[in-house]
């Protein structure tokens, strides 16, 4: 998986791809069903592994990770402007407006800082898969924040123990923290419409 601030195209992929495939096959053997949507951080190995398992499942690239990657391609003096344009695009109110601002973003940043535009194009339509979902789900579907917050909270709770004797111990500790309420989870935004499948992709081609 991508480290924070690391460029997606700089990641080692093949060993990680095999590790992810092996882990996924274990979960499938335990009853994991084909997902309706894959939400990933942008790691090339992760994306390749999941695509080999579920080639027809829509994939959403985390918009927070992509924002960090855009900033890594821009001089610090432009960070505020990149962020403003990116947020205007990602948090637009309709699918059509998201796509309109995507085109404007690329036109502007191809001229102003080519690396920023190239980084956005690297993700392609996978950065905008959330627009195929009911709008009530957009907040949760845009990022991997929910999973990462849970992970960070778990690490914070066990930081004094540093090393656990086994994976089973880690799982037991996690569920005990969850059951006791020390770690809490909330329903994802738009949970009422989760049964609705993603719409077909009808995104305008970006000039």
Where does each model-flagged region fall?
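Catalytic center-proximal scaffold of phosphoryl-transfer enzymes
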Residues: 1-207
């Amino acid at each position: 998986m991508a480290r924070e601030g690391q460029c997606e195209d700089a990641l080692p992929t093949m060993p990680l791809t095999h590790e992810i495939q092996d882990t996924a096959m274990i979960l499938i053997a335990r009853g994991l069903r084909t997902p309706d949507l894959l939400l990933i951080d942008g790691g090339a190995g992760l994306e390749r592994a999941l695509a080999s398992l579920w080639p027809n499942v829509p994939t959403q690239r985390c918009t927070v990770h992509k924002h960090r990657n855009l900033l890594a391609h821009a001089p610090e003096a432009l960070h505020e402007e990149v962020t403003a344009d990116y947020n205007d695009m990602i948090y637009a109110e309709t699918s059509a407006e998201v796509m309109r601002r995507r085109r404007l973003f690329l036109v502007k940043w191809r001229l102003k800082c080519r690396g920023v535009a190239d980084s956005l194009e690297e993700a392609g339509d996978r950065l905008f898969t959330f627009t195929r979902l009911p709008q009530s789900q957009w907040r949760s579907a845009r990022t991997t924040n929910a999973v990462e917050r849970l992970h960070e909270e778990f690490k914070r709770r066990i930081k004094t123990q540093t090393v656990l004797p086994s994976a089973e111990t880690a799982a037991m500790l996690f569920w005990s923290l969850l059951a006791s309420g020390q770690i809490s989870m909330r329903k994802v935004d738009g949970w009422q419409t989760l049964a609705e499948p993603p719409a077909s992709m009808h995104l305008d081609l970006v000039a």
